[in-house]
């Protein structure tokens, strides 16, 4: 496996972030205010559908459910595609803290990185980064448990409803919408499903502004 196949990089790989400081900033700013900033930034889902990220988080936040979930779709199945692999391999903490930010904003307490089976070699690195995040958020008073879940190689599981069915132990098949995952997602609970790159951009926006 080459150490890097990326010839040109941007803030995703270059920028260092003080994640605790960013979370303090957002906690001081307020959840609704940050959602509006995320909407103003124009960030859309980077997985292909292009749904406004701020609106998705706003919809999940508005749901009156004690159980909500954050899912990172890292089931990168397009032939020749390795964007998510590079981000997870070289900027995993940005992904994890982007998910933590989403959890804080929406009120979710649990999340999963759904990762393609071929990327299992990353799990040790990812679990170390997850453990570090979970230790750091204790001082912030944030409760968020994050785990890894591996796919079985089905291309269709890159689609969010098929991915959720797979996570629940069912055959990974997509379903008609509505209902949407923001209201009836994982375990039929409100769920944010965003792509790897989307979560990274969210934490960068949290630090730099819209």
Please give the residue ranges for each predicted region:
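Terminal amphipathic helices with adjacent charged low-complexity linkers/tails
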Residues: 1, 110-123, 128, 146
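Iron-sulfur (Fe-S) cluster-binding modules
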Residues: 1-41, 108-113
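Short coil/turn connectors at secondary-structure junctions
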Residues: 7-8, 32, 40, 64-68, ...
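Gly-rich Lys/Arg/Thr-decorated short loops/hinges at beta-loop-alpha junctions or inter-strand turns
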Residues: 14-19, 72-84, 181-186
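Conserved phosphate/anionic-ligand binding catalytic regions in large, soluble enzymes, centered on
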Residues: 40-59, 153-165, 169-170
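Structural signature of FAD isoalloxazine-binding scaffolds in flavoprotein oxidoreductases
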Residues: 60-72, 194
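Histidine-anchored nucleotide/phosphate-binding helix
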Residues: 91-105
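Hydrophobic alpha-helical positions that pack around
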Residues: 123-210
């Amino acid at each position: 496996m080459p150490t890097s196949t990326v010839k040109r990089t941007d803030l995703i790989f270059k920028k260092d972030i003080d994640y605790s400081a960013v979370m303090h900033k957002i906690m001081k700013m307020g959840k609704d205010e940050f959602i509006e900033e995320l909407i103003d930034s124009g960030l859309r889902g980077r997985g292909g559908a292009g749904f406004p990220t701020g609106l998705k988080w706003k919809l999940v936040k508005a749901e009156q459910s004690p159980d909500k979930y954050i899912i990172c779709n890292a089931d990168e199945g397009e032939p020749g595609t390795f964007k998510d692999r590079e981000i997870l391999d070289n900027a995993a903490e940005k992904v994890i803290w982007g998910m933590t930010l989403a959890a804080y904003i929406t009120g979710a307490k649990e999340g999963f990185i759904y990762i393609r089976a071929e990327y299992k070699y990353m799990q040790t690195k990812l679990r170390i980064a997850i453990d570090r995040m979970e230790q750091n958020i204790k001082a912030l008073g944030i409760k968020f448990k994050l785990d890894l879940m591996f796919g079985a190689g089905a291309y269709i599981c890159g689609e969010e409803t098929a991915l959720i069915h797979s996570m629940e132990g069912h055959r990974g098949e997509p379903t008609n919408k509505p209902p949407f995952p923001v209201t009836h997602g994982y375990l039929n609970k409100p769920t944010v499903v965003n792509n790897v790159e989307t979560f990274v951009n969210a934490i960068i926006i949290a630090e730099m502004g819209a």
